[in-house]
Swiss-Prot record:
Disulfide bonds join C25-C51, C27-C72. GO terms for molecular function: chemokine activity. It comes from Mus musculus (Mouse). The keyword Ubl conjugation applies. It comes from the Eukaryota. Keywords: Cytokine, Disulfide bond, Secreted, Signal, Ubl conjugation. The gene is Cxcl14. This is C-X-C motif chemokine 14.
Amino acid sequence: MRLLAAALLLLLLALCASRVDGSKCKCSRKGPKIRYSDVKKLEMKPKYPHCEEKMVIVTTKSMSRYRGQEHCLHPKLQSTKRFIKWYNAWNEKRRVYEE
């Protein structure tokens, strides 16, 4: 009986630990250096209950050196703020030439 109770307790602890890992913010570290021309999509996701800041997710083109990977950039870093500012300006300029 004690063995069964111990096994259930360990199972409960394992479930709680897996939920804690899944509730962390994705953007905790600085991402790789990405060029504006390599970006396919830039997403800014709002704050979630488990994450205190917004998430900035960059999807690269399949022909770039990162080959279509998604990278999460830390929103509070100055480099990320500059990247968003300059990417939006670059994207607007590119749109004018495409139309």
